Amino acid sequence: MASDSSFPGASSNVAEYSVSEISGALKRTVEDTFGHVRVRGEISGYRGPHSSGHAYFALKDDRARLEAVIWRGSMSRLRFRPEEGMEVIATGKLTTYPGSSKYQIVIEQMEPAGAGALMALLEERKQRLAAEGLFDPALKQLLPFMPRVIGVVTSPTGAVIRDIIHRISDRYPLRVIVWPVRVQGDTCGPEVATAVNGFNTLPDDGPIPRPDVLIVARGGGSLEDLWGFNDEIVVRAVAASHIPVISAVGHETDWTLIDLAADMRAPTPTGAAEMAVPVKADLQASLASQSARLSSAMSRFFDQKRQAHRAAARAMPSADQLLALPRRRFDEAASRLTRALFVNTQKKRVHFDGHARQLSPRLLQRRLVELERGVTMLGQRLPRALEAFLRERRTAFTHRANRLSPEPILRRTRLTGSTLEQLDRRRDQAVRLLIERVKRRSQELDRLMRTLSYESVLERGFAVVFDAQGKPVKQAAAVLPGDALSVRFRDGDVGVVARAGLTIPDPTKGQ
């Protein structure tokens, strides 16, 4: 018994509890004492909602840490999306978990710890995304001048979508496709990013046409209301969009990160509609003005061409002038040909008369008498020999007489006359061919003149460069940096300024 008395309080009246009892007592004490509390702290260990919709994380400061949980119902009512490292004010009740002797706060409401905390988080995110190049002006795309389809990412109800559709209908009616999203709350950012990515994945020839420009719009609100448009996934989706994006979030004084990533920022949703489409009446007026100017320019152009044609026609010699020299040469050739034919005919006639005199019958008769006399003399001495010889000579004479007949000469004379007639016909044909050849040459010269004119060269896509005095520039070495030049195309002149002089290519390049 003495040994039992050595334990202090062993026989005292201190109540004894089991572990479950003391844990339950602590739970009731904590919940009764701290029924509703407001706790300021920094979110730590936040990984987003669980698959069940609940969120588990901790609130901490520089000296302590408090576990926290938000049930799914409370999570859906939050007006902003919790972020790791965000300083918040949480309203809820403290409770314990007897199974592990831990206590935690069950959060019913939560809000950022003032605008300063959100602004600090916003500035940190802005600098980080800017360092990645998501706000680079080089990534900005030009808006199409006349889009066929416009995609709008906004709430399907409310004044914003009505203002956009009304403004587009007034300016230039076209097809508008609305992708409905929540524009506030925890799911705002993911829904907007999904909508932007969804529009970009639409095929060009699908049942739903792919928009040519996107408008992401929301009305004005507080920093907390617009916080979903500062979400990192929204910024990345807009920066990666292949479709130009117009940001129209809040009023003109409201700025969100989507404004920096978008290709164009509009002060209001109505302003976004005005940026997206032109005014149809203005286009019609501009088209009429351009049409009138084009008609006037064409009239002036044709007038100039007519004047140039008349001037060229006056400068060209007439057909009589072109044919004067060939005609003179032809007349001279014809005159020489006539004289030559006459002289040749006379020569042939004299030659023919000479042959005719040689074939006179009187001379033949005289020669025959002489031969008969000789034959008579010879016949007295050698009758047989003479008779044979006479027969031989008579035969030879007959043969020669036949050869000396005037018929071949007459036939040749007729042939010469036929040749003269052919020459006369050939002369007439040569004159006609010469005239045709001169006519074709004249037409070729006319076509050549039109081809070699510099207006036709301009029509083939070339240009003529003139200096400040209006003189054509023929060499690149004549152009100095800063010289004012005029480049004449087929449809007008363009003034330019030379940025550099003659550039001599390096012969070593390309080897």
From Swiss-Prot:
EC class of this enzyme? hydrolase
One GO biological-process annotation of the entry reads:
DNA catabolic process
Respond yes or no to whether keyword Nucleotidyltransferase is given for this record.
no
One example of the protein's molecular function in GO is:
nucleic acid binding
Q: Name one GO cellular component term.
A: cytoplasm
Q: Disulfide connectivity?
A: none
Q: Which Pfam families match?
A: Exonuc_VII_L, tRNA_anti_2
Reactions listed under catalytic activity: Exonucleolytic cleavage in either 5'- to 3'- or 3'- to 5'-direction to yield nucleoside 5'-phosphates
Q: Does the keyword Cytoplasm apply?
A: yes
* Enzyme Commission (EC) number: 3.1.11.6
- Record key words, sorted: Cytoplasm, Exonuclease, Hydrolase, Nuclease
- In terms of superkingdom, the source organism counts as Bacteria
Q: Where in the cell is it found?
A: Cytoplasm
Write out the function statement from the record. Answer: Bidirectionally degrades single-stranded DNA into large acid-insoluble oligonucleotides, which are then degraded further into small acid-soluble oligonucleotides.
Q: Which HAMAP family match?
A: Exonuc_7_L
Oligomeric state and interaction partners are given as: Heterooligomer composed of large and small subunits.
The UniProt similarity line reads: Belongs to the XseA family.
**Protein name, as recorded:** Exodeoxyribonuclease 7 large subunit
Gene name of the record: xseA
